[in-house]
Amino acid sequence: MRSIIEVLDRAKAVQKVRSDYKLSLTLGIGESSLSSYRRGLVLPDEINCIKLAAAMHEDPALLVAEMQAQRAKTPELKKLWSGIAKRLTLHPC
């Protein structure tokens, strides 16, 4: 499962931008939001997961599942979302 930092770095690479500022402009996500993601203060919501996934040319469901697993507050929810992410990785839509 990828960290949000790995996701942001991949989105920057795919979009061929060097800074989070440029990525924020490309995605239409506030620079302060991207900064909060990178610093580990919050994880992106579903709408911003969709934008990030589109920037990486990936299935948004996978990124949503990965972020939900990371924000899960119980072991059961973490296991559920991790399992969904794993299945989406093995059997992409």
Task: Please annotate each region the language model reported.
Residues 1-18, 22, 59-65, 80:
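A short, Lys/Arg-rich alpha-helix, primarily the initiator
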Residues 15-36:
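Short alpha-helical DNA-recognition segment
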Residues 17, 40-54:
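Short, basic-rich loop-to-helix N-cap that marks the start of a DNA-contacting helix
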Residues 30, 41, 67-71:
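The DNA-recognition helices of helix-turn-helix-type DNA-binding domains
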Residues 32-35, 42, 61:
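Key DNA-contact positions within bacterial/archaeal DNA-binding proteins
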Residues 35-36, 50, 64:
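Key DNA-contacting residues within the recognition helix of helix-turn-helix
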Residues 65-93:
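Short, charged recognition helix plus adjacent turn
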